[in-house]
């Protein structure tokens, strides 16, 4: 005889939340799913370049390999852009 009630509760209208707002609904075993990145703000889908560093990994990599910080890389690009506009 199979065991009864061994499967988790299924929520057919689970809310996916990104940055405090509901971005979509889906089926899940959790009533709410909190995400940092989704297709609406991912650089691949939006066409923008943005460094998302929630745990300091990019800065740690830049320091380890002597490349400065992630912010200095973007500031160099902005400085070059200003110089080319003159």
Curated annotation (Swiss-Prot):
Keyword annotations: Ribonucleoprotein, Ribosomal protein, RNA-binding, rRNA-binding
Compositionally biased spans, kind Basic and acidic residues: 76-86
Keyword RNA-binding: yes
PROSITE patterns assigned: RIBOSOMAL_L31
GO cellular component: ribonucleoprotein complex; ribosome
One GO BP: translation
Single GO MF descriptor: rRNA binding
Region (Disordered): 65-86
Domain of life: Bacteria
Record family assignment: Belongs to the bacterial ribosomal protein bL31 family. Type A subfamily.
Assembly notes: Part of the 50S ribosomal subunit.
Function of the protein: Binds the 23S rRNA.
HAMAP family, per the entry: Ribosomal_bL31_1
Name by which UniProt lists this protein: Large ribosomal subunit protein bL31
UniProt gene name: rpmE
């Amino acid at each position: 005889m199979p065991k009864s009630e061994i499967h988790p509760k299924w929520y057919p209208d689970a809310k996916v939340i990104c940055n405090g707002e509901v971005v979509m609904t889906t089926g899940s075993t959790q009533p709410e799913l909190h995400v940092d990145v989704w297709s609406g703000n991912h650089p691949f889908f939006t066409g923008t370049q943005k460094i998302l560093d929630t745990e300091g990994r990019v800065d740690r990599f830049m320091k380890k390999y002597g490349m400065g910080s992630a912010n200095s890389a973007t500031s160099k690009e902005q400085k070059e852009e200003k110089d080319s506009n003159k």
